[in-house]
Amino acid sequence: INKLSEEKLAELQNAVPGSVVEAYKSPKEALPHVSDADAIALWGFQDIAPLLAAAPRVRWVHSLSDGVERLLTKEMMERPIILTNSHGVHDRSVSEHTMALLLSWMRRIPEAVRNQEAGEWIRPRGESLFGKTILIVGFGSIGRAIAQRAKVFETKILAVKKHLSTELFADHVYTQEELMDVLPKADIVIAALPSTPDTENFFGADQFAAMKKTALFINIARASIVDENALIDALEKGSIAGACLDVFSKEPLPADHPFWKMKNVIMTPHTASMVPDFWNKLTALLQTNFVNFSRGEKLMNEVDKKKGY
């Protein structure tokens, strides 16, 4: 369920001779056509419940996202449906986007653009990333990719993850239980957690209060991991210096949302992964799994439905 090109659709269908591959723009548009479907691919934030109710034959669901939050319905949990995701596909594009946001903030690029539009020659004084401490909360493949790129700027990388392990691109690794102790050490806090029941509102008033007043908060993961009202409050009160955001609790962002007018917020409209390379990698993964599925072989990126990732 996505706008795939005719070329990509043909590639998928040709990979499994005798198969039928159809694409629809939305779950609502697809609903009348899924009764005989064996597999469905859609975004992890789309509502799958009506589709599964109308598709008794489905044995495999693939999330075009890393996240699968809205796919874990009662029927999904109860039926023997294999669930896979697009883990690893987004790493390069999302990590590059994160660095773009971070550098834009540090070098005050949005302010320079506003001055350009106003025809004003003002020279805002930016900062260097050199020597800064970056805390990455959620150190999966995207978190590691961000760390790898940030290390080029000679930064110190702190990682928070569920279980301790040695990490090539992290100077120190902490558990989630140690988050409150490590937050005050960071100049930049990057949220890279999956969306699960355990991570809902993971960043709230207490977490923002524990950060430096000069800290920058970046969320390129999922909106559900942040208490958005608490973030707005922290930004308005100056508890933190600013935020760079690619995900929001409601998308498109409502016209009256406070973020629109906040000069200490840089926003992008959920575009961190939207580059041509992403689509090529995504369809390659989908094609590999489609072939494996048709042969009864093990699928890549199978999700533990109980854990949610």
What positions do the PLM features span?
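A short, aliphatic-rich alpha-helical micro-motif
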Residues: H33-V34, L52-A55, L129, D181-P184, ...
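Glycine-rich Rossmann-fold phosphate-binding loop(s) that bind the pyrophosphate
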Residues: F139-G140
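An N-terminal-biased, well-structured beta-alpha scaffold segment characteristic
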Residues: I1-I82, G204
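Rossmann-like adenosine-cofactor binding region
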Residues: L164-P258
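Rossmann-like dinucleotide-binding domain for NAD(H)/NADP(H)
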Residues: L83, T214, I220-Y309
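Phosphate-binding beta-alpha-beta segment of Rossmann-like dinucleotide-binding domains, i.e.
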Residues: E78-T133, Q148, V152
